[in-house]
Amino acid sequence: MNLRIVASHTIVCLCFAVASNAQIYKDPKAGIDERVEDLLSRMTLEEKIAQMNMNGMGEYRQLPYGAGVVESPFISVQEIARMSAETKRYAREHTRLGIPPIQIGECLHGQLAMGATIFPQAIAQGSTWNPALVERMASAIALEASASGVDQALSPLFDLAREPRYGRTEECFGEDPYLVARMGTAFVEGMQGKAEYTRAHGIAPGKLMCTAKHFAGYSVPAGGVNLGPASLGEREMRTLHLYPFEKAVKEANVCAVMPSYNEVDGIPAHCNRWLLTDVLRGEWGFRGYVFTDYGGLSHLYNFHHVAADASEAAVMGLNAGVDFEAARPDAYAHLLELVKAGKVKEEQIDTAVRRILRAKFMAGLFEKPYPDPGRLAEVVHRPEHVALALEVAQESAVLLKNDSALLPLDASKLKSLAVIGPNADQVQYGDYTYTRDNRSGVTILQGLRDRLGNRVRINYAKGCDITGSDRSGIAAAVEAASKSDVAVVVLGETSVILSGLGWGVGLGENEPRDPFVSG
């Protein structure tokens, strides 16, 4: 009798032990919050901290505790897919808990990878005044990038293009907060899926998580110098610069937010608790995670000088509400020692890691099929995406002036046409693209030659370079114009130069470049 009682108790205890050890976090039918708590309860402090840091994809196998995020290298989509499959397979099948990393990629106007479709830049997207078109474009970008393993896009920008000297205007949708909010939320819902769906089901296959940046007031620095301070005041901040981000959170359910490099009214964004916690989470109910701009926490001690060192920067960032450090462990590399020293509570680590894990479960990282390089040809740079890029470009065109109804040009009435300017024979794809090679596009000069053939004589002259003070080509440009019926003058700038202009340097040929790299 007693033996049977003991045996039954043993069976009950064994069943309870098996049930309590069930890996709920691996069950796709369980709720996201339930999966997060189950996984978090199994993690060591070292494993938790690893989730708050980022490394290169090629480094993953050497990391003892894994990494929260890996970065897609700037190579071909086929190579990215191959590396992604290897990295994620190793993470899921050969590490203690099988936690896959989030794979991030630049996808501002197409995936930053060789072979992906290049769409017009954000400033052109905003000029379409067509949110539905931008939503379709973002959906196409997501389809291409997800095929090579990307889980999260470091886009779009919700900055306002209100400072013409600021070097990243091309990345902005425009200057009006309402327009930027409409275009930005359309981009997010195209890339992530409709907010109603993502709130209920997470990120669908073929979609990506988005990152709203740069939070906030980044694009109006003093003197137009990138990273420069902004003096805005709370009313201007809320009315103009916070408005688009609020819409991204409340209406589009954006998954991540990236703080800006600069300071607003004396407080750097990466340690601004009012911005990252009180407003973002307390007022707007943001449930995603805060992802630093590259080196953003390091800037607290080596640029803004509000922290003495990387350790203090880590404390300041974590207290403000920064969950994740990119692009390499620096400040958050000190979290373990800070917890042991009592300067950071493990509960703070848990809070940040919960948010990161929640993003991973939302994106389906534990169940996603591994990327297949063999099927990329079916998805990437498909004809309908190229046609869509052309449609965006066509709708982005803005006619500022048309004296005497000169446009459109009638080739039957022209004998000669001058094509002049430093950008006439150079394709401008915009920044965050994998190529500047004319072979990947059509220059204005080549397009006119193709269109007009031998019917109209084209007189081409470069005239000058975009930078420098050499005026030796001006005479040829004047001559080309004087012997032509009409002149098409192709001016503007290039993204390479804009990255110099906005960083507070001049446009001379030998000007130094700023050492900081923007994300």
Stretch-by-stretch model annotation:
Residues 18, 22-519:
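Glycoside hydrolase catalytic-domain context in secreted enzymes
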Residues 8-17:
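Bacterial N-terminal signal peptides
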Residues 1-8:
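Positively charged n-region of N-terminal signal peptides that target proteins for export
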